[in-house]
């Protein structure tokens, strides 16, 4: 399985859901870029589970520990490595997965790919827990891009047929992006957000989960980024 991605920068993700830690190595970051560590932790806290019944009950704090690549809050130019400890694991809850794979998960395909040697606890390397290091990378790159005037943001567009107010197709401001970013439940219309949360809690009480749609926007991107055929926006997403 490839957990490595490389273009202008490279990302290598490591760890498993119930191992000691998970983490990421980011290479080719420009040297001398200021990284506000407190803002980085605030960004990571947005991903961490909430105690409102709408997220996983797993209580991870998602506190990244930077091992290399940052000195005096500035990138040094060498690979930036960070790891995040796993502190709330209940591996016994997954003891039967080697014999009874869950539908909709990677338990079966992972066993086929790795001949049964893969770590099934919590989903192992296939777990949503591995999005935490990706959020770390996004937080780092986001600070670098915002210094150049490029802002990216997202909100929950819909959950179970309940829709939030969409971003404008012609004019989105930095303030629009930052307003949603500061919310515990990232919607533009708080009344619709309350309806979403109620549906999520009801589904959770019944042992179910709900699907949703995210709308993401980037502003102030320079024109002409990418290439035809394989490196346009839709082409890149399709890959």
Residue ranges and their predicted role:
Residues 10-15, 22-28, 80-82, 110, ...:
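Short beta-strand elements
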Residues 44-103, 107-109:
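Glycine-rich, N-terminal phosphate-binding loop and its surrounding beta-alpha-beta segment
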Residues 1, 102-117:
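Acidic-glycine-rich active-site phosphate/pyrophosphate-binding loop
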Residues 1-58:
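N-terminal, positively charged regions that mediate nucleic acid binding
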